[in-house]
Amino acid sequence: MLNIKCIPRKALVLVLGGGMILPNISPAMINDTAGCAGAGISYPYIAGANDNPLFISSDHRPTNNINQVMMMEIIRTINNQTTFQTVRAARHHIIPYQVLRDFYNAVITRGQSNPLELRTFGQILLHLVDNASRLYQNTISLSQLDDARSVALDFMHGVVLGDETRFSEQQVSGLYAIRTLFTWFPANIFIGPDTSYRFDDPGNGFEWNARSIVGAENFNRLEALHNLMVAYINKRNTLDHGWSVIMLARMVSMVSLFKALDNVVTISNAQNWFEPPDWYGDERVGIGFNGRVEYVDVQNLNPPENMRKKRENKNNFIVKRLPTIADPYCLMAPKIVKKKLVASLFTDINPDLNTNKEPKHDELRK
């Protein structure tokens, strides 16, 4: 059970991206005795304890304090009739959030007895923090980045943090920032219609249909990372020295994969999302309206020999407009640049990249 003897509120609540409050802390946990003596927060050191900032203990996404909703407008052409439909947009994980959470917790748990694994994981976290200093400069403060960097450096030195039971205000700040940066790293996110509009959403599974959205190279890296994380999770309780050596080698491979990923959030467009596939084996992601797939007539006369999807009409689905405000689930405020979204930092490099103008259709098709 969490034991907070004395802690300032700012140590518990981090406001990132204009109103994003990080989860896992309830108002009932806060002791309103700000200003009293005390060096930090007292926690029981239990793997997976609900209120231990070392661990990611909740599936819940950050709550949105200002009711921002990300929407996208779809142009639909059916039987030569063009209509416009606004749908809720969402950021979709490719490597599932649950896998990232379980992997993170497993590394921290094993870190006490396997410091080399923790040190290697620290390299990944430091890489993400360094990227955040460039990509999220408008949505995360320098002090929070410094706190996160200190945590990553502690891990790189094989230190689980402090004396195992007490964390300073800066460590709590850094841990919550690190956890968010890891579970929402940009290369693992693509933007498209909300799950309720998808007919092939994988739920808590790996997003196998994202290859055409993020590109083959990044997809292959993410698939490799996913497989390595799952293998690590499955062996997290092993005490065998041989397996520990293998797990460390896999962790080293993950460092290279993380560093090779593009540091952008990808947006789905007409080519990689909305054009219906010709074959079941096509890797495009599909969208449906009114609870069914309206634009595809599935003919399966002689299964499994004939697996062709026949288009009754050629339908063109195009992302027309996407707001540049940050949604509550990610630190980055995106900007449309053809098929990619970049952080507002690049405004200083190329002002043309930072615009609220509606992109032309040919820009979205490139």
From Swiss-Prot:
Record-given protein name: Putative protein p9
Species annotation: Acyrthosiphon pisum secondary endosymbiont phage 1 (Bacteriophage APSE-1)
